[in-house]
Amino acid sequence: MSRRNVAKKREVSADRKYNSKIVAKFINHVMKKGKRALAEKIVYGAMEKAEKQLGVPAMDVLTGVLANISPAVELRSFRAGGVNYRIPVPIKEERSRFIAFGWLLSEARKRKGMCSRDRIALELLEAHSGHGGAFRKFEENVKVAESGRAFSHFRFFNTGGARRSNPSNNIGGNR
């Protein structure tokens, strides 16, 4: 890790077809091994298929999906008293979108017997209507966050690691 400068956040340029940064981020998420043209073909095809089936513009489909499955909190593990707690921590919109894209693609990739375009389109349709694998993950996240809400005060503690005394002060070998 560099000690000098904090890495600057690079702006993502909007995609060609919908002129949207959200679609560009989704394409980047789908892309494997730098094959952007293939990822664009898959995403645009999936969005067009979802648009035809729902009769709603493709951008509205994607924004509706993100509204349905984007989490408001992230679960972070915290160890206290020998027990691991999963504590809900509020997150920014960009991180929320990133998690939603991950859920959407992981559930789409679990489907077998179809091409990627059809799998993503089907997952988009189901997430838009409020069911499907990605929506299930969202609901599970909400339930776990609700159950961990009692321990949410732990997020204000320093979780940077164990506290150790200075070893030079340990005269006589007391640990």
Curated annotation (Swiss-Prot):
The keyword Ribonucleoprotein applies. Keywords: Ribonucleoprotein, Ribosomal protein, RNA-binding, rRNA-binding, tRNA-binding. Coiled coil: none annotated. One of its GO terms (cellular component) is small ribosomal subunit. It comes from the Bacteria. GO terms for molecular function: rRNA binding; structural constituent of ribosome; tRNA binding. Gene3D superfamilies: Ribosomal protein S7 domain (1.10.455.10). The keyword tRNA-binding applies. GO terms for biological process: translation. InterPro entries: Ribosomal_uS7 (IPR000235), Ribosomal_uS7_bac/org-type (IPR005717), Ribosomal_uS7_CS (IPR020606), Ribosomal_uS7_dom (IPR023798), Ribosomal_uS7_dom_sf (IPR036823). Part of the 30S ribosomal subunit. Contacts proteins S9 and S11. NCBIfam families: rpsG_bact. HAMAP family: Ribosomal_uS7_B. One of the primary rRNA binding proteins, it binds directly to 16S rRNA where it nucleates assembly of the head domain of the 30S subunit. Is located at the subunit interface close to the decoding center, probably blocks exit of the E-site tRNA. Belongs to the universal ribosomal protein uS7 family. This is Small ribosomal subunit protein uS7. It comes from Neorickettsia sennetsu (strain ATCC VR-367 / Miyayama) (Ehrlichia sennetsu).
